[in-house]
Amino acid sequence: MKNVNKAFRKKDAMQLVTGKPVYMDDLAPADCLIVKLYRSPHANAMVERIDTSVAKKVPGIEAIFTWEDVDQNARRYTQAGQTYPEASPYDRLVIDRHVRFVGDVVAIVVGKDEKCVEKAMKLIKVEYQVLEPVLDFHTAKDNPILVHPEDNWESLSPVGADNKRNLCAHDACGDGDIDAVLAKCDVVIDRVYHTKACQQAMMETFRTCCWMDLYGRLNILSSTQIVFHTRRNVANALHIPKSMIRVIKPRIGGGFGAKQTAVSAIYPAFVTWKTKKSCKLIFTREESQTASSPRHEMEMHVRLGATKDGIVKGIDLYTLSNTGAYGEHGPTTVGLSGHKSIPLYGKAEAFRFVSDVVYTNHMSAGAYRGYGATQGLFAVESAVNELAARLHMDPFKIREMNIVKEGDVMPAYYGAVNTSCALDRCLKKVHEMIDWDNKYPVRDLGNGKVRAVGMGMAMQGSGISGMDVGSATLKVNDDGFYSLIIGAADMGTGCDTTLAQIAAEVLDCDLDNITVFGADTDTSPYDSGSYASSTTYVTGKAVEKCALRLRGQICKLGAELLQTTEDAVDFDGKFVSLNADPEKKVSLSEVAFASQFGHMVPLEITETHTSPISPPPYMVGAAEIELDKETGEVKVVDYAACVDCGTPINPNLTRVQTEGGILQGIGMALTENITYDAKGWPMENSFMQYKIPARVDIGHIRVEFESSYEPNGPFGAKSIGEVVINTPLPAIADAIYNAIGTRFYELPITPEQVAMAVEENR
């Protein structure tokens, strides 16, 4: 192939490295008013009285909006970027009299510059009726204190939600008699695992600017993964027609799922709609840390049964998830904790998966790369590693005996057939890469330090089956170059480049001959958005279909110009020529000009794609750590990974995606953590407290690919974006066990915990 499975440079690479104006604040109108949010200091309270009279007198202040400017009985909305009807409940108002976490919005302050807005915010006086908060998610379900007692709370989808029980969702499913199967097992691992909430920590914070156009329509330029969902979110929040809203995506400085929620879009949209003036809201780093959309805290109770020979016979999983003050992505993330972990073990005769998602008075959680699978895989993979130790078996060996194979039916993965799978080859590759036989389980370096290894495996999905929609428009321009118009959002992943490669392969042209534009709700074809690992698999297939149809149209018009039939010509990317006489030909430019001069053959095609299945990508990872027994410091000195993502459309981009995901997983395993004090105040409000690993903190990260061929994907491709974050958690936890003999069931695993465990083991 000429363009697919080739390592092309990203289309926007030079723009970014040369500092061209591509981000939201670069493109915002010069006369934007500044918007700031006055936030609650209480985790649960009612606003009794708010006095903005003095604040409004500050020179330059345009407006201050409070709950009194919002109908408290109006229909609520969700900020979640999901296909309608959303699984996430409608539980928000633009400004609610009832504030539900420290950082919830009390007032919107608008002024000519940041200085006057900051001054006005200090002059706002608020009296609260402080209520007792729900801060422990273990006690939230059926707690007499309700996070959402209001009657206009609404759940559009049957997800088991009940605001009068603090339940955002409940579900139960299974296959076979799990209790009977576990009763017959020789060994049962029964453990509880806990993963804390953690931040996406993208470099560009949440930000949006808005203005009214000449036609009286609200224009929104937002750093978002979900332009079409944002349009619906804003329409629902402001109670205005979607036809009055246009949403545009600039270049995004990272998202990782955080921007699958309309965190910043609603408030400036509200201001511009009210004032008819342009404005912008840019979150500070503190706001992005304390009032955003982090990963869900989860607790997972795993019972895993096996024979004495190591065959996993049954898995029983209960997941309790903390959605925080609002329910964005709560019902959907929790499902992946089981449906993307249990199916890895193809010989299991039974499974049960029960989940509850509860409201608390913590910051609202949301989408983060891995989307619940990360938490569930930490639990299930850690249980399998403990099973291997109990049976004195090698962790690689026990997985080789149990893994799902190509062609298997996966009851825990919605009964789907495993259409493509190279998991067995990934296991062998990583075993070789990390030199497992010579390093497992631990080596003493003789200086108070040891080196140990651990491993884990993972699966994810490729889009949301039967729901996600990807679309593309392709057209030939008048001198023979192509425009590819998409609704998917490139947030640094390089999907503009990847999708162009797919089109170029079909059209047999150079990658530079395709320009990519998106995403804009007025001009782009509908796309669900860049989330759920859907872009390459779903939108990429739409691009492939679109390019195939356009190729046919080029041949049809070329045949007209050559005065023959369509089946008598061929197109080589540059010329349409007669099969019988290749010297008789017309160039693509001539065909393009002809389409604009007296011919009725359109050279602009739009195609849409949705998939009834979501074929899983697979990954195996192994970590080698160096552990200092005196200080408890753990450093990952080597990480070996092998991914099956089907055909890698662009190996360079898939490699850096994998490296970045591994780095995030290492952070979640060792340092990243959101904690609260006794009153519900978040403790990590900057990168001084919230520690993300830098490149200098990590040793080698090595990535290889073992490609299966997915027949339903473009050129055999599956997804890559999310599966890559999942393996470091169980791998590092197991390596620490191999180093010091203590298992940890809660993340992150800190140096203090490790040092104390070493001391206890002496």
Model-derived segments and spans:
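Short acidic, glycine/serine/threonine-rich loops at helix termini
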Residues: 74-79, 120-123, 222, 231-233, ...
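Extended active-site and interfacial segments that coordinate phosphate-rich ligands
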Residues: 14-15, 122-129, 133-135, 225, ...
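Glycine-rich loop/linker segments at domain edges
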Residues: 6, 12-18, 82-85, 161-208, ...
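Thiamine diphosphate
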Residues: 232, 253-276, 280-281, 495-503
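Catalytic phosphate/nucleotide-handling subdomain of diverse soluble enzymes
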Residues: 462-524, 539
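Helix-loop-helix junctions that connect adjacent transmembrane helices in secondary transporters/permeases
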Residues: 147-238, 403-481, 683-704
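Flexible, low-hydrophobicity surface segments
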Residues: 1-162, 188, 274
